[in-house]
Every structure is written in structure tokens, then in C-alpha cells.
Amino acid sequence: MTRYSCGMSDSALPNPLKDKNLLLSLGLIIFIQLGISSIIPILPLMSDELGLSLGKVSLVVAAYTMPSIFLTPFAGYLADRFGRKEILIPSLLFYSITGTGCALAPSFSMLIWLRLLQGISVATFGVLFSTIIGDLYSGKERVRNMGYITTTFSACTAVIPLAGGLLALIHWRLPFALPIFGFVYANLAFKHLYVPNPNHTPDTRSYLANIKKSLFLHHGLILYSITLLASAGSFGAYQIYMPKLVNVAFSGSPAQIGSILTLSALVSGVISTQLVAINTLFSKRSMLLASFILYIISMGMMPFAGTYWGLAIPMALSGLAQGMSYSTILMFLSEASSAAQRGSIMAINASMLTLGQSIAPYILLLPYMAGGTAWAFITAASIMAGCVWLALRLPQTHRQ
């Protein structure tokens, strides 16, 4: 049952902390991030302990993320065909089993295989949290709750790396054991998560035809292209070349890199909680345009920061941009899709997000080799300019 809240004021919206469906849906983001954010800080330690190069050890991250690129659309189809909860619970159990197995893997090759299997289950998480929220809420409540998606991602980015680093002080295998909590979460979701399944699911041929029609009618291709370009530009700039800038230009430590990333995550988290208020003043298209312009300004400022503390302003601007952009794209897609199609629509968008992050290092590598981090940031800003061009081709929406 969808809640209709178009006429509610901000103060009349239900308390999100008392909404079990919302909390359980957002909890999926934590499990997605556990497999990345808790592992990245321990890669140098793993390299030393196992006597392997950092590049080879990084395969534990690639093995986890790659399945999502190819399998997320299929997971969305299954969620539309058989039901959200029917796909979620088995995926959670498989995730927990393979994740716990990673902590006990007797060899590096076995660890990679288990991470690959774990990544298969994560492909379903990437679509289900946004699909379920799109199913359950509408109007201002949907706007607010889509904003909480970015808030949760930001909180995970700020907290989980610290947790992984602290556990690694005891033993490098311990961060891999965190998915064991998925068993508890699966039990809670089984008992308390209410998800209305689509009333009608057509046969496969009709289903794919409807999806194709929906894409062109509701500017889906533009939104997918925006997701791909924005994720490539922002991930490459802030997750890959910002740390290089801090390390090379300012002799920054890993702790300083983490601190400046946390600043961006905190700003993103705060702004994403205010999306309802922002959407009462500006349309969704205007919010997207503003976020990409903020990205361009931020990326243009990065090479000229001068000092480590000079990075604070551009990184805060990147947080503002991130807090508005991703959730706004999800709102566009959710409103443009029916319940029977929403899983697949969100799945394709999630695949574009993962693909953008995967190709980011290669897109910015040549500019970096030619002119250092400055050229990498300029190239990333150019990518965001492309997002502005695409966003201008979206229909003007009403404020809510």
C-alpha cells in the first residue's frame, strides 16, 4: 500500500525513526558499504601480510563490485516478477554466508571467489532499497525518504572505514566478518518488513517491451546517462585523485585524507535531509542543475587549494552536490515508473552507477599522466558540464 502524502507539510510527515519499513530498507545500504568501505583501509595491511602487490590485493574490491554491473538489471527483473521480499531474504542469507566465509578463507584465491559470490547477492541490494521506498511512499514523504538514501550512504562513508580500520588492528581478517550481522538483519526483515508486490507482472516479452517504452517516454536514457557520467566524474575526482593530491602536494597522511572525505560525507548527509524543503523552493530539474554546477565549481577549485585546509571549501561543495544529485535522480525514476517496472528501472540505474565508478580510473588516467591531478580535475569538471547539458533536456517539474 502506497502512502499518499502530497499535501502534507514537513512537520506533518511521519517520524522516520518509527517507520520500520524505511529503516529496514535503508539498512541494505549499510550491507552494501560494509563490503567496500570496511575493506579499502586494510588493503595496504593485507598486501604486507600476504606478501602480494597492492594491485593484486585490490582484486578483493573489484570481485565484490563487478557482479553488480551485469546482474543488477536481472535482479530488478526478478524483484518485479516474484516480489521484493522473496528476493531480498535469500540474498541476505547468501550474502551473510559468503561474507563470513571470506573471513575464514584458507587462501587468497578462495577469498576472491567468495567475494565474487558475495557480490552476486549485493547486486540485489543495490536495486531493492530504492525500489521499496519508491513502492511505499509518494509525494513529500518520498522526496524526504529518497534523501535519506544519500544520508545513509554518507554516514556509512564516514563511519564504516573507521570500524574496518579498528578491527584490522586486531587482525586483518576481522573486517571481512562484518557480514555475519546479515543473519540478524534477514530475521528482522522477514518478520517486520512489509513490501507490497506489484499487482500485475506481464510475461517476459511484454515486460521488456514496456520497459523499453517507459525509458523513452520518461527520459530514462537521459537519467541513466547522467548517473553514468556523474558517478564517473565524482568518483574519479574525489575518491581517486583527491587522495593523490593530498599525498603529493601536501604530504598528507591517510588520516588527513579520511578526514577531508568525512567532511564531504557529513555535508552531503545534512543537505540530503533537507530535500523536502529544497524541493518546495526549486523543481527537481533545477536541483540537478545546481548540483552539477556545484561539482564543476568544486573540481575547478581543487588544484588551486594551496594548502590542505584550502581543500575544505571545495570538498564541502562536493558534499552539497552529492547530497542533492543522486536522490533527485532516484525521485525522477521512481515517479516515472509503475510498481511493476520500478525494480528493473532502478536496477539499470544502479548498474550505471557501478559502471561509472568502475571506468572512472581509466577515463581520468590519460589526463593525469599528461598534466597531473590538475588535468584530472579539469576533465572531471568537463564530464559534469556534460551532465548539465543532459539535465537541461529533462522536463521541467513542479515544486512539491
What are these regions (language model features)?
Residues I180-N199, L390-P395:
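C-terminal membrane-cytosol helix-exit motif in multi-pass small-molecule transporters
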